[in-house]
């Protein structure tokens, strides 16, 4: 789940 959250954050940034 950690990598998934990171991906979402990267998309927003």
From Swiss-Prot:
Localization per Swiss-Prot or TrEMBL: Secreted
Summary of the function given for this chain in its UniProt record: Antimicrobial peptide.
Membrane spanning stretches: none
One annotated Gene Ontology cellular component of this protein: extracellular region
Residues the record lists as Leucine amide modifications: 13
Main location group: secreted
One Gene Ontology biological process: defense response to bacterium
UniProt protein name: Temporin-AV
Keywords: Amidation, Amphibian defense peptide, Antibiotic, Antimicrobial, Secreted
Tissue: Expressed by the skin glands.
Assigned protein family: Belongs to the frog skin active peptide (FSAP) family. Temporin subfamily.
